[in-house]
């Protein structure tokens, strides 16, 4: 088991990673000042059926604990569920000394975190992630819900009190969720830890390798990449945007295909490949795109669908949060471990995306 210390301008906290990390939860709650009055656990139906009682049992405390459970799926990160969670919080008499526990993947972490950020103008919360994907979203304090016109468009920055990464919770994940989360691991390696990238290529031949000590090693290496960036730029005014590598096209694919029809990680994987494809053209460098593409395909990541409208995707990319005055801004790779936010003309993106789509179909 290991701990990773997160330090931002607004808060310091620890990420507990390992097979016994849930044992820290009671101590975390008991050490909070002022004392916690009561606890609301927010989860989804799939996770709650597997792990909710385990977390309740681990909370060896006197305070009242109740739960708010939503259906599973990215589409449930909605204003309706956000509002319903506030109603439940009020009905159960949460106050400013209450605590929210986010038990689930990235969708629940975002939803519960935004409820915590907005209820009575902000109360405390703890992240208890249950997916590999959430190694990214549970750290750093970005919380949000989706709008029909865009992903994560309504949200806030609200840091948790702690992150409890109990790795046994991940064992119930289906393969598509392992693959989805692993895309963010690859992202962290590509933008901030080249040694980790080479280790992944050697040690993770299939998704089945993401278990036990290898899993803990990956988490202990990938999370600090994000932690170091967040420490420099908590509210995404500069280098934190580098964490969006692959996300400009990735989010556009999620929106165009419909939330839940493609996992976040699959979208980001396609987005990273496109970013590398475009980076080779912009920077006139060899980033081994063909080798990278084959590596991704070997894990089962999808190709870009051939029937999608490039024009529509470019339009969605212009709605990305990094866009400025209608101009697409993408995170491009100058070399492994070195990325930059670059303004790209629509025509350049359109031509490159058409070529990328054609390449993915033909090969």
From Swiss-Prot:
Q: What is its EC number?
A: 4.2.3.4
Q: What is the UniProt remark on how the cofactor binds and its stoichiometry?
A: Binds 1 divalent metal cation per subunit. Can use either Co(2+) or Zn(2+).
According to its UniProt entry, the protein's GO biological process terms are: amino acid biosynthetic process; aromatic amino acid family biosynthetic process; chorismate biosynthetic process
Provide the residue positions that the database annotates as binding Zn(2+).
184, 247, 264
Where is the protein localized?
Cytoplasm
Q: Does the keyword Signal apply?
A: no
Associated pathway: Metabolic intermediate biosynthesis; chorismate biosynthesis; chorismate from D-erythrose 4-phosphate and phosphoenolpyruvate: step 2/7
Q: Does the keyword Acyltransferase apply?
A: no
Q: Which cofactor does it need?
A: NAD(+); Co(2+); Zn(2+)
GO CC list: cytoplasm
Entry-linked PANTHER family = 3-DEHYDROQUINATE SYNTHASE, 3-DEHYDROQUINATE SYNTHASE, CHLOROPLASTIC
Q: What does this protein do?
A: Catalyzes the conversion of 3-deoxy-D-arabino-heptulosonate 7-phosphate (DAHP) to dehydroquinate (DHQ).
Q: Which HAMAP family match?
A: DHQ_synthase (MF_00110)
Please name the NCBIfam families in this protein's record. aroB
Family according to the record: Belongs to the sugar phosphate cyclases superfamily. Dehydroquinate synthase family.
Q: What name goes with this protein? A: 3-dehydroquinate synthase
Q: Which organism is it from?
A: Bacillus anthracis
